[in-house]
Every structure is written in C-alpha cells, then in structure tokens.
Amino acid sequence: MKAEAEIIFVTYPSPGHLLVSIEFAKSLIKRDDRIHTITILYWALPLAPQAHLFAKSLVASQPRIRLLALPDVQNPPPLELFFKAPEAYILESTKKTVPLVRDALSTLVSSRKESGSVRVVGLVIDFFCVPMIEVANELNLPSYIFLTCNAGFLSMMKYLPERHRITTSELDLSSGNVEHPIPGYVCSVPTKVLPPGLFVRESYEAWVEIAEKFPGAKGILVNSVTCLEQNAFDYFARLDENYPPVYPVGPVLSLKDRPSPNLDASDRDRIMRWLEDQPESSIVYICFGSLGIIGKLQIEEIAEALELTGHRFLWSIRTNPTEKASPYDLLPEGFLDRTASKGLVCDWAPQVEVLAHKALGGFVSHCGWNSVLESLWFGVPIATWPMYAEQQLNAFSMVKELGLAVELRLDYVSAYGEIVKAEEIAGAIRSLMDGEDTPRKRVKEMAEAARNALMDGGSSFVAVKRFLDELIGGDV
C-alpha cells in the first residue's frame, strides 16, 4: 500500500499570509483524501505577537492540519530596518529562519521514513519564504511557491530581474509617469503604481533577490482566477521551461467568521442589525484593512466627504494602537449626531459578512488582494484607495487593466503623508454609488465566473488537480 502524503507549508507569519495559507491548506485537505496531514511551519514575529493565537484559532477544527512552531530566531534584524525598508526586514528575518526550518524538516522527513505509513511529498512556500527552496532541494523535495497576491504581481516579479540586469538602481519616484512594458499586462505600467519599496534601495534589492529565486521552484500557485487575469495567465502559459509552471488556484477565500481580538459578539451583532435596517445596495463601506491606519486630518476629510454626498455608510476606522485613541475621538465635533440616521462608525467590522449583505452598494478599499477577492466574490464594486505594499499595482490592475473598479487614487502611499481632500473623496463615492460608469454588471459577472472556476471542471479546480497530481501522483 502506498504511503499517505504529508505536505509541508512554510508560511510567513503575518495574519494576512497565515489566513490565506491556512485556507488553501483546508481546501487541499477537503479535496484529496490521500493527504494525511498538512504541517504548517511558522515562527514568531516581533511585530505580530498574536499571530500564533490567530493561526491556532483558524485550525482548531482541522485535525489534519498541524501547526509546528519554530524556536525564536536568534539575532533578528533590527526593527528600525522594518520601518525603513520592510521588504528587506522580511527577507533578512526569513534568511535567519533557514537553519530552523532545515532542522525541523530533517526531523520530520526522517520520522516519516521510519514510520513507513506517511511520506513527505513536498513543500508549499510563501513567496516571502523563497530562501527555503534551498532547504527543499537539500532534502530532494519539490517546492512550490504560494503567491498570496495576483498574476499581475507575478508579472512584475518576472520583470524585475530582467530590468535589474540592465539597470541595477532602484526606481526613481520622480519619474512616476515613466511606463514599464511589464509582460502579462495589456497596459504599460507607470512607475508611480509600482510597490513603494521599489523606490528604497534596501527594499528594492530585497524584491529583486526574492524574484530571482522564483525560477528555482517547481511551480507557482497563484491566488487568482484565469477569468480575472486572462492575459497574465496566458503569458505565463506561453513561457518556456526556464520558468516554473503557473497554477491559478484562486480565489482562496476565508468566507466564515474570522476571530478578532478587537470584536466581541455584541459589536458584530450591532453592525449586522444595523445593516438589516438599511435599504438594498445603499451602503458605502469604508475600510483600509487591518494595517490601514489613518490620522486625524485624513479622518476629518473623509467625514466631510460623507456629509457632502449624503450617502449611507459603514466606516471602519483603524487607529494607531500605540496612541490608544478611540476612532470616535478623532471625528469632527458633531459628526456622529449629524449622521446618526445614515451612518455607523466602528473600529473593526466582520468584513466578509458585511460584503455579503444585500445592503452593500460599494466599497472604498485599500485594495489589499484579500479584500479585492472578497468584494469580487460578493459582487460589490470598489473605489480604489491603496495604502502600502503592492496595493497601488492592484488598484491599477482593477481600474485600468481590468475595468472592474472606480478610481479614487491609484498611486496613493500612506507613508508619504498626503491628505486626500473631501471633494475628491466625495466625487469618487458619488461615482461608485451613483455613476453610470460604475462596473456593477461586470463585477457581478466576475463573481459568477469566480464561483464557476472552483466547481468541478472549472479552471481553478483543474489547476489544483494538476498540482496535486504532480505532487502526490496518480488520480485525484
């Protein structure tokens, strides 16, 4: 009898990456009975001390998914590096984890060989953890990169090393309108919508180093769907054997309640009861993600914009935890009283339930890829307001490349400190909620197409089958 399979996930331990990786692991377990166990290796991050509790809560009802915590990294990079060049910090901290992963994997593989009933068949590696490819090679295990971003981002990662061979310097923000012929995009991509880290020397070098390791993987699993990014996936399908095959395995979504230390049941019930009382498609939801912290001046401009438009709204405001300020303290005087009949302000909302509600009509979003996929899944159009990471590129893709969103901003970066004025915000909200050009019908069509992709015979269903057949062998 052939031994059952164990797959090892090496996941970057930030909440967003853990959430998507664990959800993907759940989908594989549900899909294939030959998988005995998926073991997820993770380590502690100084900036995300609660991540391990979050991960445990996500797998609590999953006996075939096992979390394996690694020892603390010795001599981690200084936190100052994170605030200057986050991608450089992430890469350096991951490199320091390589010996710990090597020891853990060696022990796992040896113990499985001794048991004879279970075999480790390969690694699924978060794209921030690509230094682990060398460990997989040492143990003669295939490694697959799991990209929590989209195929457009992968196109950029393919382009970066090619550009670097010609021009070794980081990108220049002052040449923001210079366009790049990034493969997989129909539109040329302006410099100003590329990830902000590419304008900082240390982060730029980290991005290039990460991208240069991609060809060492046996395959790349992308959390996107063919019907959404047809041009990008077609481009990768045409590539020769010098680049790994690309598998569109998305959308990988966590559609059940996610635990949050900031939201108790009464808060959640208050929000959902309020939504029940609102007319269909009347609410604009404003949220910039768990890390989308905005200051008092920007909060005041958004508040003024909401009063200018008169639209009903649900506004989730994340404040700096070190300041211990309530979001209500930062609002203009009298705002809550003036908007009491039309709006609700909270510090955290159950986003999946909110987007699924019939009262939702639009979403002003930071364009984190998880949020984009969730909004598309529920057919809710977006107004783009990116903040950090690759969100500017996501916003560009949604507005210019795919025609699936309304532009508020494409190139906004929260770290630069610009204050977007109320009139501009109000204009985007009006376009989102009332405009004839809002791609509401196309978004609804994409929601249906994404669901079809996951069904038996759909593009993502077939891609996951190809991946599992290659990894485990035989028929699923």
Swiss-Prot record:
What SUPFAM superfamilies does the record point to? UDP-Glycosyltransferase/glycogen phosphorylase
Write the record's keywords in alphabetical order, separated by commas.
Glycosyltransferase, Transferase
GO terms, molecular function = 4-alpha-glucanotransferase activity; quercetin 3-O-glucosyltransferase activity
GO biological process terms, alphabetically, are: negative regulation of systemic acquired resistance
> Which Pfam families does this one have?
UDPGT
InterPro entries with a match to the protein in the record: UDP-glycosyltransf_plant, UDP_glucos_trans, UDP_glycos_trans_CS
Keyword Lipid biosynthesis assigned:
no
- Detail which positions bind UDP-alpha-D-glucose: 290, 349-351, 366-374, 388-391
Q: What is its EC number?
A: 2.4.1.-
Enzyme category, top tier: transferase
Keyword hit for tRNA-binding: no
Q: What does this protein do?
A: Possesses low quercetin 3-O-glucosyltransferase activity in vitro.
Q: Which family does it belong to?
A: Belongs to the UDP-glycosyltransferase family.
Name-wise, this protein is: UDP-glycosyltransferase 71C3
Q: Which organism is it from?
A: Arabidopsis thaliana (Mouse-ear cress)
